[in-house]
């Protein structure tokens, strides 16, 4: 996930819009993002992965990648 290190706010906004457009239920995807971010925050408490990227941003980026690049999770 090193390609996420140089994201600016416009990239994050674009990815968020991409995620919202890919789903039919905005509420459900928002809850999923929040739950993933919360889970990741507590699971990775010992791991200092990248303090620049907040858990919610990381969750959005991961979910967009999973939706737009299904080959990532099929391997």
UniProtKB/Swiss-Prot annotation:
Q: What is its EC number?
A: 2.7.7.6
Report the locations given in the UniProt record.
Answer: Plastid, Chloroplast
Q: Does the keyword Transcription apply?
A: yes
Q: Which GO terms describe its biological process?
A: DNA-templated transcription
Any single Gene Ontology cellular-component annotation:
mitochondrion
Name one molecular function that GO assigns to this entry: DNA-directed RNA polymerase activity
Domain of life, per the record? Eukaryota
Which reaction does this enzyme catalyse, per its entry? RNA(n) + a ribonucleoside 5'-triphosphate = RNA(n+1) + diphosphate
User: Keywords assigned by UniProt?
Assistant: Chloroplast, DNA-directed RNA polymerase, Nucleotidyltransferase, Plastid, Transcription, Transferase
What coarse category fits the chief subcellular location reported for this protein?
plastid
**Which family does the record claim for this protein?**
Belongs to the RNA polymerase subunit omega family.
What is the documented function of this protein? May be involved in RNA polymerase activity.
* HAMAP family the record matches: RNApol_bact_RpoZ
Q: What is this protein called?
A: Putative DNA-directed RNA polymerase subunit omega
Organism lineage reads as: Eukaryota, Rhodophyta, Bangiophyceae, Bangiales, Bangiaceae
């Amino acid at each position: 996930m090193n390609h996420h290190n140089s994201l600016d706010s416009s990239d994050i906004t674009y990815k968020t819009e991409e995620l919202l457009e890919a789903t039919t239920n905005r509420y459900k995807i928002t809850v999923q993002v929040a739950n993933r971010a919360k889970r990741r925050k507590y699971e990775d408490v010992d791991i200092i992965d990248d303090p620049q990227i907040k858990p919610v941003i990381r969750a959005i980026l991961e979910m967009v990648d999973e939706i737009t690049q299904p080959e990532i999770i099929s391997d």
